[in-house]
Amino acid sequence: MKYSTFFDIILYIKLEGENTMEKMNIKWNYTNKIVNDLLKINRAREIVDLLEIPVSVEEEIKKETIAKRVHYSTKIEGNSLDLNTVKKIIENTNNSHERNVLEVRNYYNALMYLNKEADTNNSITEDLIFKVHNLVIGKNLNAKATYRDGQNIVEDSLTKQIVYMPPEAKDIKVLINQMIKEFDNKTSKDIPIPIKAGIIEYEFVTIHPFWDGNGRTSRLLANYILKAYGYDLKGFYVMEEFYDKNINDYYNSLQMGLHHNFYFGRKDADITEWLEYFISTMANTFEAVGNRVKEIYLNSKEEVNILDTLDKRERWIANYILNNGKIKAKDIASHFKINLDTANNWIKEWVNRGFLVRENDKQIRNVDYILTDKYQQKIK
């Protein structure tokens, strides 16, 4: 086991001789930035809840969101696969057993498990943590799980310098149970859910209870809390993408310039800086989703308005062209039981109004007509 300083060695010897430890005693404060960002989050929620968009579009966004959550959360931990490859893995078109592929598949399974769990459950338990972590590292959901039984030092991959020395193994269960208890504590009921999610993400990754998968599990738990308590934004948001864009900001906000040793300040840390970062990231993510939903909504409303301008004849013609590619005067005459002159007069009116257009200007007889670009784009 490696230690960074003489003081780490002395502290380790001291703690090994004790049967109990002080619990985590993190602190935080509301700041103007946190309050303003919480307001932004709630405004975005109202927009997304209020504005209905086409179901097909909604499902496509959800599908894209899941792929991005998997991609960016595993990328943060060093996975080198690109987004398109991740999508293929999720769609079961890439069955490789290469490590990066397995990591993506495992994370996807854990995400799907928690999404389903959040529909009927909103608590955090040790059993839930074990199950999620089992899936993250590729074990069966109900496999026997244990916390790490030794020290798990986090090092800089390039310099090999110690970045973080988490609590000793013997303290993990106490710290996890404290985290769970405080999350469910009645006195914490008035704390906004985004802040509670941020606290859980920080505390879990700080406790670092497992040998591997701690960062991924911490982000999964935060997303689980947001979904379970109605902050999932219909499954449209991806905070991990914002983390990845400025990965140094993410790590610096977690570390907050504190000593690398858990016992030298991290267990008593003021995490306001981290919460400002977490809530700000969430607000930026939610605002982006809200703006996207507004744009989709307005476009879909325009489509509906165009359809509303069509009478029964025009609706039939639009549907006929969509199914057959084009229409002739004789097709209209046959369906509506009118003569060709009347059908051609209707067509002339529709051409002048910008509803129909000749498919080929060189045609003189038996002319084919199609929808104008305006209607082709809006009527699908």
Please annotate each region the language model reported:
Residues 1-380:
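FIC/Doc superfamily catalytic core
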